[in-house]
Structures are given as C-alpha cells and as structure tokens.
Amino acid sequence: MKKILLSFVALVGLFTLAGCEKVNKGKYKEGTYFGSVEYESYGAKYVTTATVYVDENGLIKSVFIDSTYNKDNVSTTKKTLKDAYGMKETSKNIGVIPNGAEWYEQVEVIEKKIVEEQNLDWVKWSDAEKTKLDSVSGVTITADTYIKAVEKALELAK
C-alpha cells in the first residue's frame, strides 16, 4: 500500500512539473504578416512577396517567399514555374550546389533558415551590393529582395 501511495505521489508530481514547462516566447505579435518589394531585372518587372505566420507564443512558424513577374505581358510566379524556371543548371555551373538547385528549392532553404533562427540576424552578404547570401549554404540566387520583403513583414509583426 505504501509503495502504491509513493508511486501515485511521484506520478502526480511528475505531471505537475510537466505542466509547468516554460513556453518559449518570441518577440513578435501573433498573426500573418506580408511584405513586398518591386523591382526590374532583365527587362521584366518583379514583385517579391513574403508572408510570415507568427503563432500565439510570438514565434515564427512559417515563411512563404515568392516572386511574381511580368514579361511579354504574361504574369507568373517563380514557385508556380517550379523546375520550368530553369535555374538548376545555372546554380550547378556556379559550383556551390552539387547538381544544382531550382529557384524554389533555394528559396525554401531561406524560408526554413528564418523559421529556425526566428529572425534575420544570421544574414551575412558576400558582396558589397548585399545581394548574395554568405550565411546559408545551398543558395546561389540573388536574395536581397527576398530578405527585404521578409524584413517588411517582420517589421509589421513587432
């Protein structure tokens, strides 16, 4: 009887401590936030958008980055094009990513890094123009507009 009582007390104590687990608190307000940047490149007009979802604990739970462009009066997004965007061979030729990676695959690396780090403090540029990321492997795309769009979304989340 004594062993059963001690086991019960230990079990209640364990559940009590588990319920007191500290909840990670982020620095952002709960909600979905949007940022965008417009620019022109190679004769096409682009709008880069970033959507950032922050949960009730203030933590970044998801990031979605895409780039819409209009060329020859046709609008589409880079994520919609998937492999048809045709960046894999270019990134392979740069030599940083074995076998290369499409645009959407590279931007997913950036999205995941933002969720992991919960901020953009990790961003380091490898060029004076601040277009090439030096702080994340698997990315050869010019990333300045993507980071700027996320910055705008996170600014709204503060």
What are these regions (language model features)?
Residues 16-19:
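C-terminal motif of bacterial Sec signal peptides marking the signal peptidase cleavage site
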Residues 23-158:
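Active-site- and interface-proximal helix/loop "cap" or "latch" segments in soluble metabolic
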